[in-house]
Amino acid sequence: MGMWEEASDTGMKGKKKKKDKNEEEEEERGKKERMVNLTLEMIYLLTGEHYIPRKKSDDGGALHAPGSVIQKENNKNDEKILELMSNIIQLLTGEVAIRTHHVSIYFSLDEWDNIKGNKVLYEEGIKEEPQQLHPLDCEYEDKRDITADLGGTLCYNNETSKIGAEGTDFCAKENLTISPVEQPPPANRIKEERASCEEGNQSDCSINPLTEQIQGTDKPTPIMGYSLNNSSANYIKEEVVQCHEGNHSDMRIITAPESILETNTSAAMIRCNLNTSLSASCEGGNQSDCRINELTEQIQGTDTPTGNIVLYICSECQKHFSTKAGLARHQKTHSVFVGEEHAYGRIHTEEKPFPCSECGKRFARRQHLTDHQSSHTGEKPYACSQCEKYFPHRSNLNRHLKLHKGEKPFPCSQCGKRFPCVSDLNIHRRVHTGERPYSCSECGKCFKHHSNLTNHQRTHTREKPFSCTECGKGFKDRSSLTVHHRTHTGEKPFSCTECGKGFKDRSSLTVHHRTH
């Protein structure tokens, strides 16, 4: 009887094993059929045509091979299917995927061009076996291991733990994660600082080291300004937070490094996302209160088409900057600080809060107003140290200094004459083009220079703002006043090279030259 039952059990096991095998084969056939249907549907979406699959006939008859050979062929087919699907995803999304075990990491095409030579290195880093994490010298029910695996639960506890007054389950569900958008190379490691539970009654709520979760996203968001290189020795340090009241259990929080070395090499980016303001209280039995201090670091940014990594965007003009200081400097161009009154001349609004009391002309900055007022007063505060000539504006002095240095970096393309600044070159070009952009509103006469127009307009208004301090005679321009001063001083700076006779102005010298 016993032998019959044993034989019957053996037969049942064989049937069950055969049934399980048949179910697996059926499931495999169903999976392949679904894949074929999805492929045909994809072909229809791409071409708009329906196709019917037809089994390929073997001319040489059926081939019989051992099961291991067939299994290898199936594995190769699976790998080929995955490769084809990756190529399709790359065409549709512009992203290249590296898949290893549970991890999927997506790279943009620009990033992939930079790192595809190190594909094996990335895969080796991803394939590292999950680390087994154990409670340290603590009583732990049924001695279960907690694997630092993807999506793993942080800790187990028989009794429900709560966070603050919310009553939220902490030990069973709460996750603190550092989520790399793209896996860093193996050179970057996690350093664990061991902690030991003090002797005595231990809390039932043993909170094990928080695990690192690697999450692959369809659209990764790299951190701008922060990158990791294969050679960098930066690592994420695991800090130990201890409860200091009574009997307690140790708690660990993985914190992001304060600074990540920035390199020129395109490599894996990481995003730190730590939950904020956690206050955990383990209740029940002989337990102690635990507190997790606020720990938050969230780095965000957007990538640029050029591959440069940026963080900060100007809200006025949308210009990108890699540092906060650079953005702050740029924003001052939108709000120009003026004097002690804290008045602001807005570039975009063209506000000009400083008017000239003489002519009513307005300026955005007080310094510009001060420079302009010197044209009314005749003040020339800027002196040349080489020839002691004076100028009303610093820009005029800088232009004059180039004459002493012999700097004339701007040549005319027509005649080859060179000039110390661009503005002088632009004015000179009007000689060749005949351009006279400044016209008089009274008579329509045109002039090459704005100063000539200003002097001409005074003939209509009969304005003579420049008066002689000796005799009080007025003149419409400063050059006429300067020439007049020479009648009082007797100065004759222009001399004839033929006879040596001197003249007080250049025009008189030109008339004299005609006599020779």
UniProtKB/Swiss-Prot annotation:
Major localisation: nucleus
C2H2-type ZnF: 312-334, 354-376, 382-404, 410-432, 438-460, 466-488, 494-516
Gene Ontology MF terms in the entry: DNA-binding transcription factor activity; DNA-binding transcription factor activity, RNA polymerase II-specific; RNA polymerase II cis-regulatory region sequence-specific DNA binding; zinc ion binding
Localization per record: Nucleus
Keywords: DNA-binding, Metal-binding, Nucleus, Repeat, Transcription, Transcription regulation, Zinc, Zinc-finger
Cellular component aspect of the GO annotation: nucleus
Composition-biased stretches (Polar residues): 200-218
Entry's family note: Belongs to the krueppel C2H2-type zinc-finger protein family.
Function summary: May be involved in transcriptional regulation.
Protein name, UniProt field: Gastrula zinc finger protein XlCGF53.1
UniProt source species: Xenopus laevis
